[in-house]
């Protein structure tokens, strides 16, 4: 079979949908902790969101990611798998072969996937965060107002994903959809290296030599551990990205990545860049486990294989 395979894109779409459903509630908590105020620690944030917004508050802004992140993950996994396969085959000079992967192949393929992910995922992440951050504590802090109850007739800045897109384009231009993209690039390029590479090596390490491929249990465990590692280490730049993207809900106070880092450090110290690291790592495990398991099982079904095959 040639190096380019569409099955990877289809399997990535299914895995992406599974990861959104599993991970969005904790993603909401993570975003509120990083870009909002008045939430304290993780458990305090969960209690505040539930008390003020009920269970629906944890799923705020999920419709757009569910429709779009599935496509986003489809592209990321498709690009990674096909790039890695292309590099491995041409390194050995056998385009139709299945040569062993090297660390350099995985590293370069992960970096390519990280760059591509920003072009497609930047607007998706921005809209998700803008919808998640339509909360009273966040608005009061950014407008310098004392905390008060929301008036019944008071409307949020965005009425939904479509209204959010049109409002951003109207007020900030097309470039507004890519606010925080530079921080996202600094997060995702190393982040995907620490996502795909640990997964590949962990799944191979867990799998007995007699097996032709990792079992679903091995995929779930390796995927979850890779997600926890990747999201945990990506937290500092994830904080900067979230703040830059949430900044435009009511006003813009950051001029760019360096200004956001400087202001955040001056006001809240070094610890601010590790805000949400616990929920990031905890959320990263089930979300990535669902992502890789959905990807591998659907790829197995599409190809008619009897063993799961790593990307």
Curated annotation (Swiss-Prot):
Membrane-topology descriptor: Multi-pass membrane protein
Solcar repeat ranges per the UniProt record: 3-86, 101-205, 214-301
Record bears the keyword Cell membrane: no
UniProt keyword annotation of Repeat present: yes
InterPro entries: Mit_carrier, Mitochondrial_Carrier, Mitochondrial_sb/sol_carrier, Mt_carrier_dom_sf
CC annotations in GO: mitochondrial inner membrane; mitochondrion
Membrane-crossing segments per the record: 9-29, 61-81, 107-127, 189-209, 217-237, 277-295
Cellular localisation: Mitochondrion inner membrane
GO molecular function: transmembrane transporter activity
Primary residence: mitochondrion
Key words of the record: Membrane, Mitochondrion, Mitochondrion inner membrane, Repeat, Transmembrane, Transmembrane helix, Transport
Pfam families: Mito_carr
Coiled-coil annotated residue ranges, if any: none
PANTHER family: MITOCHONDRIAL BASIC AMINO ACIDS TRANSPORTER-RELATED, SOLUTE CARRIER FAMILY 25 MEMBER 48
Entry's family note: Belongs to the mitochondrial carrier (TC 2.A.29) family.
Protein name: Solute carrier family 25 member 48
